[in-house]
């Protein structure tokens, strides 16, 4: 599929006008397309070790998107026709608190009964990356598949004309390329991270296993209860990312356009050791105990198993992702990775690729890049640190059908109300705006930590008996409107008002969460939550209209 590497002595046509991307997966190819879109005269080279076309279905995980990543693919990169024609529209997140249960209709279901306004997608990574590779070649990007990077010699950051030198091998021939900018998009191999000693652990200790089945897994077929089946319109629960939950874990079911289904277990490393599930047979034994309905569905499809893999201790940070004077960057999993829950991987690709594109723009314009690199890196790490408390020490809550739906509501409101607003309204790359918002964003980050701590304490205080019920996110008018409003185009005053309103809503939601928990466990300490409100006086005001979900049949 690729172009053909010329003779081994080749240098780039114009190294000073070249960006070289190591890694031609989702992060690398989307960055290449974004650079080509922004700078038609820029030479963009992508080196990918895998041969194209890559296999459908059993290629890579990271198959579900949420709103930032979905917007990046569909609108920023213009991939909406491909998403509509060749991928699946996602029916939101859906949760069943069914550990050990034989019938889904007997437990709490959390999800939307109908599609919300702002779309997201389920991605067959093989289909998508083949299309990205095709588009790269069509648009004049030099995409070299089957190409192994052998050595990297970084440019001298003190010499503005110094270039990076990358030796790579394809079909037995070695070539040395030069580039002004070098980006590592090569995933967990972390070539630059290892070379520069940038690896950084975090406190989130979790593992994951996954596999693909060459068949559709439709949870609606697991029940004959007419009322339960009628809850959703359209009746297509299979298009959701379905989460089957229990203490310390969640199992994903993600449909793929190729006709396969992706299945995974993500779990706290202590509660569910990886050694109990790191082969397909062990995973099946684990399902037999924790998810008997899923076990029965998989047991009859053993002959349709397409692959199996696992990651131990999958979450990590990074000491540095952008270097302005050095003109290098990390994107995707070559930098940081949080957790598969809430599918933040594509979001962070969208954000880092956009920052990298802006850094290249500043450099091409002859402006000093160091300041922008430092600011963008600070923002990027702040977003990572903002989301990390959503996961760290929170996996026990997956087994709590009372607290977890409240946590999901909070997490979404925080994501849509703050993080998405910054991305959709192009504020993340506006250094002036981000400077003015620094204190506000730090304060709401502190509130998020306080709420996460409170939710964990609520879960530890006790468990109520689960009952059959539907918690319908689409029934919350304010929640559906928050989702719809993501695509509004706002001028500066309207954005400021939007953010102020959303912070007030987060304050109110935090206080209502405290009130609901105190109705059961009045001894819970909520002082940290109250002290972190954007408006401390709000705790003395009436709580207003109920923002929390109420069960339906």
Q: What is each of the regions a protein language model found here?
A:
Residues 36-61:
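Glycine-rich FAD pyrophosphate-binding loop
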Residues 68, 113-134, 273-278:
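Short beta-strand to alpha-helix junction loop
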Residues 27, 31, 52:
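Conserved Rossmann-like nucleotide-cofactor binding loop
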Residues 359-553:
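C-terminal helical "tail/cap" subdomain of flavin- and related membrane-associated enzymes
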Residues 247-249, 255-257, 271-359, 363-395:
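FAD/FMN-dependent oxidoreductases across multiple families
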Residues 135-293, 353:
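Predominantly flavin-linked oxidoreductase catalytic cores and closely associated redox partners
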């Amino acid at each position: 599929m690729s172009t053909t590497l010329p003779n081994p002595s080749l240098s780039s046509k114009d190294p000073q006008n070249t960006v070289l991307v190591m890694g031609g997966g989702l992060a690398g190819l989307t960055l290449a397309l974004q650079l080509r879109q922004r700078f038609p005269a820029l030479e963009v080279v992508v080196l990918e070790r895998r041969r194209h076309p890559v296999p459908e279905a059993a290629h890579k995980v990271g198959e579900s998107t949420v709103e930032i990543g979905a917007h990046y693919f569909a609108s920023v990169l213009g991939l909406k026709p491909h998403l509509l024609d060749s991928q699946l529209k996602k029916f939101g997140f859906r949760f069943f608190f069914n550990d050990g249960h034989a019938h889904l209709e007997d437990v709490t279901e959390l999800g939307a009964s109908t599609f919300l306004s702002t779309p997201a997608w389920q991605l067959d990574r093989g289909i998508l990356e083949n299309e990205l590779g095709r588009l790269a070649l069509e648009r004049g990007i030099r995409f070299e598949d089957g190409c192994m990077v052998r050595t990297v010699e970084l440019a001298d950051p003190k010499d503005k004309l110094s270039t990076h030198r990358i030796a790579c091998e394809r079909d037995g021939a070695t070539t040395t390329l030069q580039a002004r900018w070098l980006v590592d998009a090569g995933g967990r191999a972390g070539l630059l991270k290892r070379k520069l000693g940038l690896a950084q652990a975090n406190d989130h200790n979790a593992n994951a296993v996954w596999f693909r089945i060459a068949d559709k897994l439709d949870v609606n077929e697991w029940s004959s209860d007419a009322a339960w089946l009628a809850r959703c319109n359209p009746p297509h629960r299979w298009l959701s990312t379905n989460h089957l939950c229990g203490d310390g874990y969640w199992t994903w079911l993600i449909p793929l356009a190729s006709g396969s289904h992706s299945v995974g277990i993500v779990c706290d490393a202590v509660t569910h050791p990886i050694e109990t599930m790191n082969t397909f047979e062990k995973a099946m034994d684990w399902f037999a105990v924790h998810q008997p309905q899923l076990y029965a569905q998989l047991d009859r499809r053993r002959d349709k198993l397409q692959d199996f893999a696992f990651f131990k201790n999958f979450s990590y940070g990074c000491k540095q992702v952008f270097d302005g004077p050095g003109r290098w960057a990390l994107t995707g999993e070559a930098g940081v990775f949080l957790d598969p829950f809430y599918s933040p991987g594509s979001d962070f690709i969208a954000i880092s690729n956009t920052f990298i594109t802006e850094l290249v723009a500043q450099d091409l314009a002859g402006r000093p890049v160091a300041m922008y690199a430092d600011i963008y890196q600070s923002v990027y790490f702040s977003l990572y640190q903002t989301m990390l408390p959503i996961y760290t020490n929170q996996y026990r809550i997956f087994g709590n059908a009372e607290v977890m739906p409240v946590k999901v509501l909070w997490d979404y409101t925080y994501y849509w109300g703050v993080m998405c607003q910054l991305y959709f309204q192009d504020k993340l790359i506006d250094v002036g705006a981000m400077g003015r918002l620094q204190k506000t964003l730090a304060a709401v980050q502190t509130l998020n930590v306080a709420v996460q701590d409170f939710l964990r304490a609520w879960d530890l205080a006790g468990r109520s008996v689960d009952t059959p019920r539907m918690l319908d996110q689409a029934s919350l008018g304010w929640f559906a409107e928050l989702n719809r409003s993501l695509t509004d185009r706002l001028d500066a005053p309207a954005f400021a008002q939007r953010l102020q309103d959303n912070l007030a809503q987060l304050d109110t939601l935090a206080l209502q969460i405290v009130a609901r928990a105190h109705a059961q466990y009045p001894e819970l300490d909520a002082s940290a939550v109250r002290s972190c409100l954007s408006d401390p006086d709000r705790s003395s005001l009436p709580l207003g209209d109920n923002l929390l979900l109420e069960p339906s049949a």
